[in-house]
């Protein structure tokens, strides 16, 4: 019954900690450590290791857990952050953006396939900008190498997101670009890695 958890905090960055005996606990701590909860955690540091002493849920993204599309996107976002950010990289702004994107996903009434890829693309673009690796000229070269129409499609997608007011309108328009959005997400993933 021990649980190794990865915590992403506003003030201390990414922290690895162990919750001893949590799976045997009759308290709700094991539920509190669900990856889709914003929690307040009390940690004890022994040598270079952290131990979870207490956990309290601050915000629960409960609607994400009820929709497989929302769950898929949210877990992808968390997995990406886990791979990109190193332990103790403090970044309060990015933490706030992470909570913002999870809150956004949580309140969406539905997610169409094209919009799902659009959210992932927007998230990856945000990470690339944050990490200082977003270079539109280099991305344009990669897109152009595959097909020259790719740049046109990418610009159309950016226009849709700027010019559309309603979420439902954006979702409908993104359906025309499902395959292209999926391809761009893969290109962005490769670019980050």
What are these regions (language model features)?
Residues 1-3, 8-193:
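Non-catalytic alpha-helical scaffolds and adjoining flexible linkers that form interface surfaces
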């Amino acid at each position: 019954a021990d649980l190794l958890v990865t915590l992403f905090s506003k003030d201390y960055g990414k922290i690895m900690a162990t919750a001893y005996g949590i799976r045997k606990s009759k308290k709700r701590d094991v539920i509190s450590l669900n990856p889709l909860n914003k929690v307040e955690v009390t940690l004890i540091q022994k040598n270079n290791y952290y131990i979870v002493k207490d956990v309290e849920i601050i915000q629960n993204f409960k609607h994400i857990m009820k929709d497989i599309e929302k769950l898929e996107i949210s877990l992808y976002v968390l997995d990406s952050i886990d791979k990109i950010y190193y332990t103790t990289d403090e970044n309060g702004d990015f933490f706030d953006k992470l909570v913002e994107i999870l809150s956004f996903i949580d309140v969406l009434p539905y997610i169409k396939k094209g919009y799902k890829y659009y959210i992932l693309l927007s998230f990856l673009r945000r990470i690339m900008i944050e990490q200082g690796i977003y270079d539109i000229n280099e991305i344009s070269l990669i897109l152009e190498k595959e097909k020259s129409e790719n740049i046109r499609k990418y610009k159309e997608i950016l226009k849709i997101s700027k010019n559309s007011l309603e979420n439902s309108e954006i979702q409908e328009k993104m359906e025309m670009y499902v395959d292209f959005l999926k391809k761009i997400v893969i290109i962005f993933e490769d670019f980050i890695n």
